[in-house]
Design a protein with these regions (language model features):
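N-terminal Rossmann-fold NAD(P) dinucleotide-binding loop
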Residues: 3-4
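A short helix->loop->beta-strand "cap" motif at the edges of active sites that frequently abuts
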Residues: 101-105
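Catalytic helix-loop patch of NAD(P)-dependent Rossmann-fold dehydrogenases
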Residues: 79-91, 113-151, 155-160
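A generic structural motif
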Residues: 13-19
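NAD(P)-dependent short-chain dehydrogenase/reductase
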Residues: 131-133, 143-192
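NAD(P)H-binding glycine-rich loop region in Rossmannoid oxidoreductase-like domains
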Residues: 42-87
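SDR active-site strand-loop-helix element
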Residues: 21, 63-67, 106-112, 116, ...
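N-terminal Rossmann-fold cofactor-binding loop
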Residues: 20-29, 44-45, 68
């Protein structure tokens, strides 16, 4: 959802030299052929030696980390806790170390799910109280180093692969839908982010 949208946005802009990394060759078909040469496919992003070598060969000015296991993925397909912690918690810090060595600025995407929602009207000064493994793993992955920016976000948008997100569900409805009362969604679309 987010990684694909961010990749498309920067690939279509001629004022940026963009290289996007995919974890699956099959996803390459989701992008226009004119952009295919701007993609690298690293099927095992957790092959740290290979991934580090590739990043260091690129020497990016800015790296945007969109890698993560989402809450929805965890609910649909139970994933081992070790894998969730590795990708959502440890990987961002490993990536930060490489970016620090290169002088690369790192933008890391986190989530509003580090808050339970019990209090409401949260600000960045509030103490996180994640209710589940997803929120806890994303909180552990947040970066607070020089040359890093962690963005806590809640987004809605089109999913490019499984088409089972909230927006697709809503657009597929042919009649009235039941909703909620007194609920505030303060997220943005992936295009706005």
């Amino acid at each position: 959802l987010l990684g694909n949208t961010i990749s498309k946005y920067f690939l279509e802009r001629e004022d940026y030299q963009t290289i996007a990394i995919l974890r699956d060759y099959a996803k390459l078909k989701l992008f226009h052929k004119k952009f295919h040469q701007k993609f690298l496919v690293i099927e095992n992003i957790l092959d740290y030696a290979k991934t580090e070598k590739i990043i260091k060969s690129i020497k990016p000015d800015i790296l945007i980390n969109c890698l993560g296991i989402t809450n929805k993925e965890i609910l649909i397909n139970p994933i081992q806790v070790e894998k969730i912690i590795t990708i959502n918690s440890l990987f961002p810090h490993w990536l930060q170390r490489i970016c620090s060595d290169l002088g690369t600025r790192l933008i890391h995407l986190s989530t509003d799910c580090i808050f339970s929602g019990n209090k409401g009207f949260y600000s960045e000064e509030d103490i996180p109280d994640p209710p589940d493994i997803y929120g806890r793993s994303k909180l552990l992955g947040e970066l607070n180093y020089e040359n890093t920016l962690t963005i806590r976000k809640s987004v809605i948008g089109h999913e490019l692969v499984n088409k089972k997100g909230l927006l697709e569900w809503f657009l597929d409805q042919t009649n009235f839908v039941q909703g909620y009362k007194n609920v505030i969604f303060s997220g943005i679309t992936v295009l706005e982010l």
